[in-house]
């Protein structure tokens, strides 16, 4: 009986170990300090960050009293982000505008880069480049940052009294309220990842089948949905932060 039990345990452990090593597609890795780093995501993320930083430098390099076209555009983007933050968070939205704005702009430019930048031209030893948000590692990281942000917002506003929300309106709902905090980052990450991955797959399939006319409307639709996904993510992040500060559901 002991031998059978040990065999089953060994089989389960080895099976789980093999499953944990399963990968979808081919990936390009860097070895840094004994760790495997997903290089594809880092490369494309650095490109997106460089675009954002370069645009910001150009926008604030020589501000004018009478705004130019470029300055007008960036002021419009800032006002838009402030409006989203104020609507979802409330009067204490000010300190959270940089965080919400960073989320929105990074996701927006990442999504659009998948449709506009010719990532496939760059050859890698393994795998291929794609939008940063086309990788589950990126979307989960963004969702976890959002989780840390709304926990910090609630704790900084209410202290340890923040945790009283888990037993409101009745202690019976404690497991459900705890589960809710785990499902928030999951829903954020998988929604963004699924939509961007599906959009790129549809374009790739249509280009391979009908390479001239049909993919163009789908690409324009992809640009639209990419912007909507960035707005949804930023809006929900702001709503979660506002909810944690107000303590309502």
From Swiss-Prot:
Pfam family, one: ATP-synt_A
Role noted for this protein: Key component of the proton channel; it plays a direct role in the translocation of protons across the membrane.
Keyword Membrane in record: yes
Full protein name: ATP synthase subunit a, chloroplastic
Gene3D superfamilies: ATP synthase, F0 complex, subunit A
NCBIfam families the record matches: ATP_synt_6_or_A (TIGR01131)
Recorded topology in the membrane: Multi-pass membrane protein
Protein's cellular compartments: Plastid, Chloroplast thylakoid membrane
Lineage of producing organism: Eukaryota, Viridiplantae, Streptophyta, Embryophyta, Tracheophyta
GO molecular function: mRNA binding; proton-transporting ATP synthase activity, rotational mechanism
Known partners and oligomeric status: F-type ATPases have 2 components, CF(1) - the catalytic core - and CF(0) - the membrane proton channel. CF(1) has five subunits: alpha(3), beta(3), gamma(1), delta(1), epsilon(1). CF(0) has four main subunits: a, b, b' and c.
Keyword terms: ATP synthesis, CF(0), Chloroplast, Hydrogen ion transport, Ion transport, Membrane, Plastid, Thylakoid, Transmembrane, Transmembrane helix, Transport
Family membership: Belongs to the ATPase A chain family.
Keyword Transmembrane on entry: yes
Transmembrane region(s): 40-60, 97-117, 136-156, 201-221, 222-242
Gene Ontology terms: cellular component: chloroplast; chloroplast thylakoid; chloroplast thylakoid membrane; plasma membrane; plastid; proton-transporting ATP synthase complex
């Amino acid at each position: 009986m002991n031998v059978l039990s040990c065999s089953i345990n060994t089989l389960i452990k080895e099976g789980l170990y093999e499953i944990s090593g399963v990968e979808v597609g081919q990936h390009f890795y860097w070895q840094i300090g004994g760790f495997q780093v997903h290089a594809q995501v880092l490369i494309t993320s650095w490109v997106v960050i460089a675009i954002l930083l370069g645009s910001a430098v150009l926008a604030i390099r020589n501000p004018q009293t009478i705004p130019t076209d470029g300055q007008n555009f960036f002021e419009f983007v800032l006002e838009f982000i402030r409006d989203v933050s104020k609507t979802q968070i409330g009067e204490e939205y000010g300190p959270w505008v940089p965080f919400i704005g960073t989320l929105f702009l990074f996701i927006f430019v990442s999504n659009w880069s998948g449709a506009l930048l010719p990532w496939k031209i760059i050859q890698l030893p393994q795998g291929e480049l794609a939008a940063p948000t086309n990788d589950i590692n990126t979307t989960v990281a963004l969702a976890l940052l959002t989780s840390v942000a709304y926990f910090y917002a609630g704790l900084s506003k209410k202290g340890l009294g923040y945790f009283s929300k888990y037993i409101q309106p009745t202690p019976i709902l404690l497991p459900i309220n705890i589960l809710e905090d785990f499902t928030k980052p999951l829903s954020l990450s998988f929604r963004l990842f699924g939509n961007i991955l599906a959009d790129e797959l549809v374009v790739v399939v249509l280009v391979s089948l009908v390479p001239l006319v049909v993919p163009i409307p789908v690409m324009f639709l992809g640009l639209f949905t990419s912007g909507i996904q960035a707005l949804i993510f930023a809006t929900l992040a702001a709503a979660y932060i506002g909810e944690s500060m107000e303590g309502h559901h």
